[in-house]
């Protein structure tokens, strides 16, 4: 990273030019951030405290909630601070840390979502083997592999990005540090690295998508063979939240990274980045708690217990 020592800080894209709009954006981000912390925090606490939820499905949901909570905490607090204090700066080290943690958490989240599809596949297509295929040790190993692969992926891409010399200014057209925007500041021809980065990321996301799609093809075939409509409805209700979360996560990421350059602009890029980096972590707890009766019951029991403690 010594090649980039001439850059000591970066300037992030401001949300608005006027002070009133900056404060409005601060209030908006604060509301979304608190909602995400509350939603994911409730899921974490409910799954950890309710022994009825100590199953593989909820173990992976706990991992997802933890990743969502950490992911939104990587980008939003700095954006809120900049809007509140009317500044745009982030230190070089802070930017590197933001890239490292964001890529790590997003990569691990895609892996967890893929594992959750496998969990639903085994539960519906191979119910008699569920205990042996998804025992406590197997679940812990899969979760560790997801977190570990995300961290390795992040280390490689962060080191690749910040090893480049930067001499095209220090202004990033984004409200947080993203690798494509940093590569645009490189003195060297970074197009090959940027293309390789896009290809690797796309291949990994596509591999997750193919595995998830294959799992759900098998799941839907198994559901159609179920004799009872009630069993079909119950099986579908356990899959619907995961399908919704996967659709939201992958669709927003694809729009962000595969949109045509001809329609790209700083304002549009910022909106798209907001959609894929802020919206899923805030909305995922709502998606999972809407149709899941077990989780709703555990959440209401937890809320009732908390209210009782404050009386």
Positions of predicted regions on the chain:
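Transmembrane helical core of 7TM receptor-like proteins
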Residues: 1-311
């Amino acid at each position: 990273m010594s090649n980039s020592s001439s850059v000591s800080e970066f300037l992030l894209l401001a949300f608005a030019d006027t002070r009133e709009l900056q404060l409005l954006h601060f209030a908006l981000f604060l509301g979304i951030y608190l909602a995400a912390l509350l939603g994911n925090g409730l899921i974490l606490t409910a799954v950890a405290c309710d022994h009825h939820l100590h199953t593989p499905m909820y173990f992976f949901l706990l991992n997802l909630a933890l990743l969502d909570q950490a992911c939104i905490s990587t980008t939003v607090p700095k954006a809120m601070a900049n809007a509140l204090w009317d500044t745009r700066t982030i230190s070089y080290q802070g930017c590197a840390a933001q890239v490292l943690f964001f890529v790590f958490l997003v990569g691990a989240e895609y892996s967890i979502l893929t594992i959750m599809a496998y969990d639903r596949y085994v539960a519906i297509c191979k119910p008699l083997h569920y205990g042996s295929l998804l025992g406590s040790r197997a679940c812990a190993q899969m979760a560790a592999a997801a977190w570990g692969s995300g961290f390795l992926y992040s280390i490689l891409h962060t080191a690749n990005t910040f090893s480049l010399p930067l001499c095209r200014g220090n202004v990033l057209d984004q409200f947080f540090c993203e690798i494509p925007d940093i590569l645009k500041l490189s003195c060297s021809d970074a197009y090959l690295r940027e293309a390789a980065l896009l290809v690797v990321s796309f291949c990994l996301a596509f591999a997750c998508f193919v595995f998830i799609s294959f799992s759900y093809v098998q799941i839907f075939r198994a559901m159609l063979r179920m004799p009872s409509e009630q069993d079909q409805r119950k099986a579908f209700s356990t899959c619907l939240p995961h399908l919704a979360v996967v659709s939201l996560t992958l669709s927003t990421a694809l729009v962000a990274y595969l949109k045509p350059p001809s329609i790209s602009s700083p304002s549009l890029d910022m909106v798209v980045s907001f959609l894929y980096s802020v919206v899923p972590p805030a909305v995922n707890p709502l998606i999972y708690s809407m149709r899941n009766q077990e989780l709703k019951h555990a959440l209401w029991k937890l809320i009732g217990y908390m209210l009782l403690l404050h009386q």
